[in-house]
Amino acid sequence: MNKQKLKKFFDNREEFAPNERLWLFCMLMSIAGFWGGFTYSLRGRVFVNAQTGNLVFLSLGIASWDTALIKNALATFLAYFLGIITAELISKEINKVSFLIWERILLFFSLIVTICLGFIPETAPFEFTNFSIAFTAAMQFNTFEKAHGMGMATPFCTNHVKQASAYFVRFLKTRDSSKLRISLSHLSMILSFITGATLSIFLGRFFLGKAIWLSSVFLVITLYFFSKSLKNYKARKLK
C-alpha cells in the first residue's frame, strides 16, 4: 500500500465528512484503550468502556457482598447509562446551531475531564475518576458511530474482532478488495485500542494518576486535526 492509498485508507476526504473518517476513530479508540487500561490497573479494576464486565463485577459484588466492588461497578454503570442519555438528548439539538459543533464540544469536554482527573489525589475514591471517564466514553460511543461508511464503536473491541475476522474470511472466498479493506479497518481499531491500553498500564507504573494526561495530549492532537479537517471540508463545500 503506497502513501497515497494509505492516506485515503485512514482519511478519505472525498467521500466522507470529518466525523466519519477512520483516523479519527483510531485516535478515539487509542484514547478509550488508554482509559480502560488506566481504570483497570489504577482505579479499582473496573472497565469504563464496556459494561458487560462491570455487570459481572456487580453481580460478583452482590453475591459476595463486597460493598466496595458493588459501589465501584454500579457507579461506572450508572455513569455510562447517563452518558448515553445525555448525548442522545442534546447532540442533535446542539448540531442545529453549527455543523458538527457537538463533536468539537465533546472532544474539548473530554480534554477538560482528563486534565482535571490528573489532579485528583491517589487517596481519593475511585468513583470520581471512573464515573467521569465512563460518562465521557459513553457520550463518545453515542456520538461517533460510523467511519468510512462502516458501523464503528469507539470504546470497545468485541464487534471489531467479529467484523475483522468475518470480512477477512469473505475476502478469502471472494477476493473482493473492499472486504479486505473493511477487515483491515476494524483491525486498525483493535490495534489502536491495544496501543492505548499498553501505554496507560506502562506509564501508570511510573506516574500513577498523572498518566491520564497522555490521553489529554491525544485529545489535543485529535481536536486540532478534527477542527482542521472540518475547516477544509467546509471550504471545499463552498467552492
Task: Map each language-model feature to its residues.
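Alpha-helical transmembrane segments of multi-pass membrane proteins
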Residues: 2-239
